[in-house]
Amino acid sequence: VALGGSRCVPQWRNTMESAGIELGYMTPPLLAFPFVGTFRGSCAVGLAPKPGAYHVDHFRCEFAAFREGLFSTDFLGYTEVQGEYELPALIMTAGEDAFDALSAYSEWLYREGGCRRIERTQVPRWWLGPFFCGWGEQGYHSPTNVYAGANQKAYAAMSERLDAFGLKPSAIIVDDKWQRRYGELLPDPVKWPDMRAFVEAEHAKGRRVLLWLKAWDNEGLSSEECVKCLCTPYGADPTSPTYRRRIQETMRRLLSAEPGCFNCDGFKIDFANCMPLGRNLATHERNVYGIELLKRLMTLFYESAKAVKPDCLINNSCCHPYFAEVTDQCRLHDYNGQLRSLWEVREFRARLFKTAFPGISVDTDDPHSTSHAEMMNYLRRAPDLGVPDLYQLHRRIRDEDLREIAGIWEAYSARLEKSVDSKGGKR
């Protein structure tokens, strides 16, 4: 049995799960299949391209007639060969169980595969939360258009409600759509007449401000800044010099404390899986495709942001050692609230993230579920999984729930402060 698949959830929960690792919520995921069988422990078979050569978007394993045990990927015509070419390696690693075998795969990539290991023992205290994200609450403030709820007045009201219930997040996340245009990545002046004033007010309360960032979207971008499919703009192109200059200047505007800038503190990067994929794509730098193109985008965001504010937080859902150097924190990502296995699925994802990035902090994300009991169970247990994250302050969250969550957060923060003091971590 291989633990993997396109949606990165346990194989046993999906009877028709394809044996393919693709770019889903975890983008990219670990490109390895750990097998268990009659033998002891687990053996993983993984793809290991060299740095700069991740021009792929999937890794498949086929167990059909005449193709049993076939591992494959596809370069889709984006790899040009003049002379000799070395295919990405297939490596085999072993462990006591599936996760142990995946850990060995990750370790090989750090040790032999050119991936950069990041020391994560001392990070800024505020990176570890708790967090409040306004996405769920935007729908309360604007029931007919959740995006309209991403405005300064609504977020100021959210901040006041946090205060009223003694909820003390280390950061507040301004979610989709604070931007006027997704690709431009600048505040909508109608929704946010003075974002700097909001940020400074949150700073005065001891909170940082993170901005939700939609990757790839070309809204507001020129054709020159885009990946094209048969001459049609298809998404932001991180190899375009014009787009690169835009992002570098935009990061300065969003993060700098200089006059005329917004002094925000980092980004929650979403929609990485909605990247341009398939044949006939054209980038400014020829033949950069798939995971390699995503690495270029994440590197552009990360390096441009850190050049302005070194302690800013970059939160994303990458889950592969090749992305360790552009990832400060992992987010467990969306869950189908119509299902009833929230903890099981999120715990599984957290183990995968920590397998790819040893020591990383994990944003436990939205506790969305159709069941109030399951939602509260998740919020109570979230500190055992990672950084607690709250998305709602009304509707299914009751006043007594908020008071309970305030107590959970207080206990979590006290444990964290004690740990930081004993380890000498950053504040």
Report the location of each language-model feature:
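Extracytoplasmic/secreted cell-surface and envelope-processing proteins
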Residues: 181-184, 219-222, 275-279, 323-325
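Glycine-rich, aromatic-flanked loop segments that form ligand/cofactor-binding clefts
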Residues: 108-133, 165, 173, 194-232, ...
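Glycan-recognition surfaces
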Residues: 219-245, 249, 295-424
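Active-site-adjacent "subsite" loops/lids of carbohydrate-active enzymes
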Residues: 129, 139, 143, 147-152, ...
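Active-site groove signature of glycoside hydrolases
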Residues: 166-178, 247-284
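Alpha-helical scaffolding segments of alpha/beta enzyme cores, especially the outer helices
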Residues: 157-160, 193-204, 249, 253, ...
